[in-house]
C-alpha cells in the first residue's frame, strides 16, 4: 500500500487550527500518512505591486530592481511571521503520533496574476498530495481576495483530488 499524502492549507485563522486538529484526529498514529503543511501568505500590498515608472530606461530598470527587492523583503517578513503557525500545526500533528519525517512545510506565496486556488492545486500536484484540506474561515478571506468561491474553484479545477473543507 502506498503512502497517502495530504496538503493541509493553513493561515492564521481559527478554521485552520480546526483543520489541523481534524487531520490529526483522523490520521493520528497512521504510519502510511504524510502531511504537507502549506501556509498561504497574504497578497502583496498594493504599494509593492508596481511603481510609478520613469522616462529614462536606466531609471526604470533601477525602479524595477528596487520594487523586486522590496517584494522579496516583504515575502521574507511574511514567511517569518508565518513560522509560529507552522510550528503550532506541526506540534499538533506530532502530538497525535505522526512521525516528524512525515511532515513537511511549504509556503504558498502570492503569485502575480494567478488565483490562489491554482497555486494550491499546483502545489498539491508538485508534492504528490491527493487530498487537500482547508478551513472554512480562511476561505472567506479568499472570497474577498478572489471575488469568487475558492472551494468551488478547487472542486472545479481539482480533478483527481479529494477536498476536505473543515468548518
Task: List each model region and its residues.
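Small/aliphatic-rich secondary-structure junction motif
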Residues: 1-70
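Hydrophobic structural packing positions in well-ordered secondary structure
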Residues: 6, 23, 93, 120, ...
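Conserved beta-strand segments of the P-loop GTPase G domain that flank and frequently precede/overlap
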Residues: 8-10, 37-39, 106, 134-135, ...
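A conditional alpha-helix N-cap/helix-loop micro-motif detector
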Residues: 16, 113, 144-147
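Short glycine/proline- and acidic residue-enriched helix-loop micro-motifs
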Residues: 64-76, 103-105
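Low-complexity, serine/threonine/proline-enriched polar segments
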Residues: 73-88
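Structural beta-alpha unit
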Residues: 91-131
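Gly/Ser-rich helix-loop-strand patches that form or flank binding pockets
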Residues: 121-167
Amino acid at each position: 500500500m502506498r503512502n497517502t499524502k495530504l496538503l493541509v492549507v493553513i493561515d492564521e485563522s481559527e478554521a485552520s487550527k480546526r483543520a489541523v486538529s481534524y487531520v490529526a484526529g483522523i490520521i493520528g498514529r497512521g504510519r502510511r500518512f504524510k502531511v504537507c503543511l502549506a501556509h498561504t501568505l497574504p497578497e502583496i500590498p498594493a504599494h509593492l505591486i508596481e511603481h510609478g515608472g520613469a522616462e529614462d530606461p536606466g531609471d526604470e530598470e533601477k525602479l524595477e530592481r528596487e520594487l523586486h527587492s522590496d517584494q522579496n523583503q516583504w515575502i521574507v517578513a511574511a514567511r517569518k511571521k508565518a513560522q509560529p503557525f507552522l510550528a503550532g500545526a506541526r506540534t499538533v500533528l506530532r502530538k497525535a503520533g505522526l512521525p516528524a519525517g512525515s511532515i513537511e512545510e511549504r509556503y504558498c506565496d502570492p503569485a502575480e496574476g494567478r488565483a490562489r486556488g491554482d497555486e494550491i492545486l499546483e502545489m498539491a500536484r508538485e508534492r504528490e498530495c491527493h487530498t487537500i484540506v482547508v478551513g472554512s474561515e480562511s476561505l472567506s478571506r479568499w472570497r474577498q481576495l478572489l471575488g469568487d468561491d475558492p472551494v468551488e474553484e478547487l472542486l472545479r479545477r481539482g480533478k483527481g483530488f479529494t477536498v476536505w473543507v473543515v468548518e
